[in-house]
């Protein structure tokens, strides 16, 4: 779920119910990059998401969401939880490693939402992430 999505009432209602029912087969990953579709999240909310979900009887695990090992460890921990759902809060950097055509950074840029990388931006990003643009996968 995204920063904007976690603010939506439907996700909050489902979150309250899942905690109340103790749905321990539910693991939700929250991509917390502090940016939503049109602005930084602190422009529209000051809530503590972790405390809110803990109050709803969720197990909350906060990690570096850009670290694959931290994600694996959190998922292993979450699968072992019984009697309550788990929220993994991955603190991430939106556009991590993405570079513009002029090689400046796309990181933490709200305008990056829905903006596909093409041309030189694509090539610069693959290079910046340690890949080969001629064989990126």
Question: Model-derived features: where do they sit?
Answer:
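Glycine-rich ThDP/TPP pyrophosphate-binding loop and its adjacent helix/strand module
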Residues: 1-137
């Amino acid at each position: 779920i995204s920063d904007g999505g976690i603010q939506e009432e439907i996700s909050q209602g489902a979150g309250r119910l899942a905690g109340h029912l103790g749905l321990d087969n539910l693991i939700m990953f929250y991509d917390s990059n502090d940016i939503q579709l049109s602005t930084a999240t602190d422009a529209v909310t000051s809530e503590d998401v972790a405390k809110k979900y803990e109050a709803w009887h969720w197990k909350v695990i906060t990690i570096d969401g850009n670290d694959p090992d931290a994600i694996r460890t959190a998922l292993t921990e979450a699968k072992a939880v019984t009697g309550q759902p788990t929220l993994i809060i991955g603190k991430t950097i939106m556009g991590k490693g993405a570079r513009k055509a002029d090689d400046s950074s796309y990181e933490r840029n709200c305008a990056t939402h829905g903006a596909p990388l093409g041309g030189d931006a694509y090539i610069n990003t693959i290079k910046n992430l340690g890949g080969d643009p001629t064989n990126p996968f």
